[in-house]
Regions:
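C-terminal non-catalytic regions of proteins with extracellular/luminal or membrane-system context
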Residues: 86, 93-98, 132, 168-169, ...
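Aromatic/acidic polysaccharide-binding cleft in carbohydrate-active enzymes
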Residues: 17-108, 116
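Acidic, Ser/Thr/Pro-rich beta/coil linker or hinge segments at domain junctions
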Residues: 135-184
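A structural micro-motif
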Residues: 13-14, 53, 139
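Glycoside hydrolase catalytic-domain groove-lining segments
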Residues: 1-25
């Protein structure tokens, strides 16, 4: 995993995108579930590869495609996906030279924390097959999954992403993966920080 710089940082966005994904037509029945995280993260990665613009998610807490439940305002899976994207993926986009294919949508950016290194997102959209990546050194891994595609609760490294009793956000911490082969199970979205 040695990406080449694809575009330089540009703080003046050129494209502003609204009504993306599930917003058109009132949303889909799975927009509030883990199943939609694949679309959301793929959209963020693909959009970043072509512009430094902005994606506006038009609904915070209304209907099925809102980031929060419209009844109790609990964060849905896409909320946590966008939160992790913003915490991990930096503004400089790298070309991974990996073609998008089933089982491996690979995106690479600078690290959002400003430290040297690279942040990757690998989306394994295969419902049945794992995929493998090679890590050149130990890495921090945030692996998103769920008990079922239509689950309303997403897991990060096996821990449910739900609010605490005091409505605080959960602590989202990585696990360390040693250098070498890392197997990514089917139907997972994995952030890898090197």
């Amino acid at each position: 995993m040695k990406p080449e710089v694809k575009q330089k940082e540009n703080r003046h966005g050129t494209i502003c995108k609204t009504e993306s994904g599930d917003a058109g037509g009132g949303g889909t029945t799975w927009a509030s579930t883990y199943q939609d995280v694949f679309r959301t993260l793929n959209e963020l990665g693909s959009f970043a590869a072509i512009t430094d613009g902005i994606i506006f998610h038009n609904t915070l807490a209304s209907s099925d495609y809102g980031y929060l439940s419209h009844t109790v305002f609990d964060p849905r899976p896409n909320y946590f996906a966008a939160l992790l994207w913003n915490r991990i993926m930096g503004r400089t986009v790298y070309d991974t030279a990996e073609p998008i294919r089933e089982g491996a949508h690979v995106f690479a950016h600078s690290r959002a924390d400003g430290k040297p290194g690279t942040a990757y997102l690998v989306i394994n959209n295969s419902k049945t097959d794992p995929t493998t990546v090679s890590l050149p050194k130990d890495a921090e891994v945030y692996q998103l999954s769920a008990e079922a595609l239509r689950a309303g609760t997403m897991l990060c490294n096996g821990k449910p992403l739900v609010l605490g009793e005091d409505n605080s956000l959960p602590e989202i911490t990585p696990v360390t993966a040693p250098a070498g082969e890392l197997t990514l199970p089917a139907a997972t979205c994995t952030f890898i920080v090197l």
